[in-house]
Amino acid sequence: MAASTKPTTKLSTEEDDVSRRDSESSADFMKSNEELQATMIPEDDGANPATGQPTWTILSDTEIKSVLVVASFAAAISPFSTSTYYPVVTAIARDLGVSVSKINLTMSSYQIFQGVAPTITAAFADTYGRRPMFLVCFVTYFVANVGLALQNDFTTLLVLRCLQSTGSSGTFALAQAVTADITTRAERGRYLIYATLGSTLGPFIGPVIGGLLVKFLGWRSVFWFLLCMGTVFALLIFIFFGETARPIVGDGSIPPQSWNRSYLQMRSKGVSNLKPNLASLERRKSRPNPLTSLALLWDRENFILSVSGGLLYAGYSSVTSVLASQLQQRYKYDAVQVGLCYLPVGFGSLLAYRTTVRLMDWNFEREAKKQGLVIVKNRQTDISRFDLEKARLGFVFPMILVCSGLLVAYGWQMHYHAPLAPILVTMFLIAIILTGVMNAIAALLTDVNRENAAAVGAAMNLTRLLLGAGAVAVVGPLNKSAGIGWTATVTAGFSYNVNTKGIQTKRRAAAIFEVSRATLHRRCDGKRARRDCQPNSKKLIQQEEEVILKYILDLDTRGFLPTYAAERGMADKLLSTRGGSPVGRDWPRNFVKHKAKYSILDEDVYSFDEAGFMMGKITTQLAVTGSERRGRPKAIQPENREWVTLIQGINAAGWAISPFVVFAGQHHLSAWYEEDIPRDWAIAVSDNGWTTNEIGVEWLEHFIKYTDGKAVGVRRLLIFDGHESHHSLKSRELCKENNIYTLYMPPHSSHLLQPLDIGCFSPLKRAYSREIEALICHHINHITKLEFLPAFKAAFQRSFTSANICSSFRGAGLVPLQPDIVLSKLDVRLLTHIPAASPEAPWEAKTPSNRKKKQIQKRGTLTKGEGEDTLAQKEADQQIEREQRQGGEQSGRSRQALARSLEALEVGGVAHSLNGSFV
């Protein structure tokens, strides 16, 4: 993993110095990252390295509670419209002249639409936002209440109750979606009391208000009251409620569309200083799909959870729906007294948020601690490796058993006309337990379907209300035939058996969920999957390991050498914060071994450097010299000292990148691209044939283009010297964008550590010299770019072989890495050798090649293939132009010749004799 570290000019081998330096670096890093503690961390605005999760919302705790309270009161119109209707059933039946059973059908139809309508509302809310759909629901609700207050027949009552349900029920699913938008999984139970405050108060306040209204003002006043209440809640949404949908506003830092802002947001003239966090935006659905809720129910887990919650709600509905009629028949209570009897149900639901719902959060944190998961305030918990079902449903099944027993007790108490006090206490306990169970199931459904929070809320709403409507429709006739005691017993037994014993054997469960029996047995015994469990020797949790990785990369960025001592010191610091023992001696080595994805493979190690060629410098020519002179005499062509630069890269696996040649000049000439060189060779031009910062960037782009498809790992290492053109700002940005790590060699060490200098450039120049010797033998002693390219091609193919490249890296001690060899090479005194001057015999070159050269591009870089294509296009254009011009000239010359012939015939006096034949 340390392949990307940068060597320095002064290397210390003292272990004490290394340990002291690493300790200081780790202390600085810990000081600059206070959030590294693997405990409950206060909220802030940035991402937390202990969890790797960003801040979930910019809203403060008070703002979250305020938003949830407004949304919950808006959602209260649905249960409020249901419960206020209970005391007026008898009065409406009497005034309309129909039976109570028919009026009960309006309650069943209300619940059916209460389940179906949210599927449409949720689909539009996930696309266009929560706030617009709240307002649409309220407009529909207003129209229905006005009609209900003015109607006079049963059919109109039935239709308008369905419309009222359509407008009111959508708000319940929207409130659930708002809760998922601004609260995390670990904190959802704590905020549920605010998110469901309105919907909890509605069922037990509604009957009281309905009873008072029907007693003193008549049953029509109930619907006028609902209209007024809905107007107040709609004004709260219009004035105070801001958009929360994460596909639109993200974590709240992104402003919504102008038409989707609250009245306070539109009136506010201040400009927010918050920087929009675009990363918090979730994928937005292109169009609403009302069938999304049904598609979610098609999933087995969602279906089982929804049906379980629906059956519990059906049992609850069977209790509350017949309570009013039973109290009036058995205890002769009036509407007000019946309404007051619903108060224990409401108080029980409120108390549930201080008992059973808090128990849900406690169980979540307990399971997270067992599984090594860090819970951080205002940050979403990663559940990819977390047993979420056990955390949410660990306490549910015992509570279902207790709730079923209480339901049976309630039925037989009513059957034997027991005193009212134990009946109300039983209802109070049922409300406490049932609210906790229902919220646990709803939280689990929301957790596993976070991106479709509104749709999954509508799916659960659909299931429970359809089952509740069926229970309400059946419970009346069943009470008459079997009595309320047996009705409650059958309902409780059915709910308990389906929820706890629906799948009798593990063999059957394995067949249903398509898993092996052995796997299912291990899961039932509490054994986790191998990919989800940590070895016993693994002291650090995943988040702590990520902190160490960040620390190592930080050391590398600042130029320090990450060592095993540094890794061990950082790990011990993290463990000491939670009372853990230090890591073992071999832990750093094993840590690096297990984090292979952060290392750089040998196949992804590259080196590049420049080499210069002076085209006027050619090799041996025949000359008379002293017999004792050693070596091959050289001759320099005085008329041509043009410089050519080669920028070459090689890979440690034994292959070379296409050459990048820099010529002196202003334009790319067509003749260069007529030579027989590969199409992927690149040619650039500069004023003097040397490399520049711009050319360095162009070569880096050439390198990225050539090596992107050949990378084995996720990182590439590029080794080069410290020339200015190698580390310009643009070059560093390109390397960072493409995950390229750079390794600068110490000054004056490239001849010792650069693989190209060690084993490639020397053979290349010798091979090039032999090619020029061959040209001399053919009487070509003036070398231009046109002679250089084919000669260089032959020399390159002979010298850049796989064996030479591999031996170059091996000789430099880089691949395979041999630190001792590298350090021993650096421990030398660098001397500058000044060769003695030697006279050179002047000579006169022959006439150079006179091949026609055309300018095809100014500046920039062209590969051989691009040059050929440009040249071919220009030649085609010139040929077309030439043919058009020649055609015009030919026709002009023909007309002139004809005129001269006629003039000559007339002058000779023979025009009359030849006129006929001419014509």
Swiss-Prot record:
GO molecular function (one): transmembrane transporter activity
The keyword Glycoprotein is assigned to this record: yes
Signal peptide range in chain numbering: none
Sequence intervals crossing the membrane: 69-89, 132-152, 192-212, 222-242, 303-323, 333-353, 393-413, 418-438, 465-485
Keywords: Glycoprotein, Membrane, Transmembrane, Transmembrane helix, Transport
Subcellular location: Membrane
Domain DDE-1: 641-809
GO cellular component: plasma membrane
Entries under Gene3D superfamilies matching the protein: MFS general substrate transporter like domains, Ribonuclease H-like superfamily/Ribonuclease H
Sugar-bearing residue positions: N104, N260, N461, N915
Membrane topology classification: Multi-pass membrane protein
A Pfam family recorded for this sequence: DDE_1
Biased composition regions of type Polar residues, renumbered to the chain: 1-11
Region (Disordered): 1-33, 840-897
Biased composition (Low complexity): 887-896
Skewed-composition ranges (Basic and acidic residues): 865-886
PROSITE patterns, sorted: MFS
Purpose: MFS-type transporter; part of the gene cluster that mediates the biosynthesis of squalestatin S1 (SQS1, also known as zaragozic acid A), a heavily oxidized fungal polyketide that offers potent cholesterol lowering activity by targeting squalene synthase (SS).
Family: Belongs to the major facilitator superfamily. CAR1 family.
Protein name: MFS-type transporter clz9
Source organism of the structure: Cochliobolus lunatus (Filamentous fungus)
This protein's encoding gene: clz9
